[in-house]
Amino acid sequence: MKTMQFAPTRRSFMTGIGAFGLSLGAFGVDLAPQDAFKGKIAGRRLKIAAIGCGGMGRGATESLISAGCDLVAICDIDPSMFDYWEKKYPGIPKFTDYRKMLKAMGDKFEAVQVGTPDHTHAYISIDCMNAGKHVYVQKPLARTVEECELMLKTSLRTRRVVQMGNQGHPGVWRYKALRDAGVWGEIKEIYSWSDRPIWPQGMKEYAKPEPVPSHFAPDSWDCWCGPSADHGYSSAYHRFKWRGWWDYGCGAIGDMAVHNADPAFWTFALGLPTKVQADTFGEGPVGVAYPKKSRIEMDFAANQWIPNGIKLVWTDGGIKPDMKSIAGLEAYAADYAAAEEARKAKKAKKAGKPYTPPAKVDPLVPGNGLIIVGTKATTIGGSHAAHPVCIAGDKAAVAAAIAKGDAASKYSHYREFVEACLANDLEKCGSKLSYAAPLTEALLIGCVALRYPGEALAFDAKKMCFSNNTAANAFLKAPKRGAWDFARL
């Protein structure tokens, strides 16, 4: 396979951030909070259309409306998703093919919310950018590295704003404050994990095709598949269960590392890994689906924040950091477990139900989190850049720095997008494309490693390819199927 030809986009991006963090504006570190934008767009609301309006798409659309958007049209391949919106907005225009919506109503809206499965994020987003629309797209940004690069290239060419939906991103200001205060000391290790998957994974073969639901339009399933392979309609794919399949989702790491590891990537300008290695705990390479549980180690090159480089360890499927190997974690886990039991007792009492506490409460590490181990302090935080706490080191210094970060974090994830679109400023959003693309790419490189458990894959960020496994490079490429070819966009 030929080397991926993404270097011009990547080089221009790397130049813009000063080679991994020497000027961190492009990573969002020095972004002004929302107050800096006030007064520029008073009274102006953004007109949007929703593509994928159930599940996360529904939640994101409602949040965008609350943040200053007017919803003018909705689109979903599954018409059963329309009922909710019809009750709220009687007579709102409805479509089952976003391309028909663009053609019929493209002059009626300025931006789109893309809340479809992972494998169609990039194609729909690029098509909409080419049609002049700003894009709010769910996480992960795309399913392959090439798709992320194509999105970045299209945004720069069309000057359309793109924001990725990692909704907890405003919380990274706390981590910036911790970094700037120097309370961690030198960063030694980073751990991030999730209790996902909560959907099927580990399948050995594709699902047996079922009849397409009678309420679907004739081309609805084709639209659902988009550029990815059509394995026939099945309830094992639609709805929700698509996440566990290689061709349609990004597994647990794609679903949750975008949230849980976000503060580490942003705060330390990690960029792309130089080496990745995965462990699937004896499951071996799975042909059609992600493994049930995994551990992925990612090595990142040195920069001004991590002068000796760093290893980030991601785990999922119930695999959590070892309590005994991280200072302070076992004591924290004991307190967390006790608090969980107290919460259960309170909930039972409120419901008027009896509650019998266990004879012994074992230490419990939360289901999702991020641990940053430094020479001076260690912190643990929850999902979506949740409030970190000190588990080892100077707790007062950590608390003071976090309070400073809280004071700086005054903006809304969704309002940022609205104001960026109205100002036509690609860099106003915290989770803007120049940050979201490399973040997602790093995780997708980890996804590829899951196909080669036990093998250390070296990644060349300049050439955007694996340097020691040519076959693995095929999984970095964007798919194409019939008319759904990125080359036509």
Q: Which sequence ranges carry the predicted segments?
A:
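C-terminal helix-rich "cap/oligomerization" subdomain common to oxidoreductases
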Residues: 15-42, 289, 420-489
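Beta-loop-alpha module in the N-terminal Rossmann-like domain of NAD(P)-dependent dehydrogenases
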Residues: 92-150
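Hydrophobic residues in well-ordered beta-strands that form the structural core
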Residues: 50, 114, 137, 162-164, ...
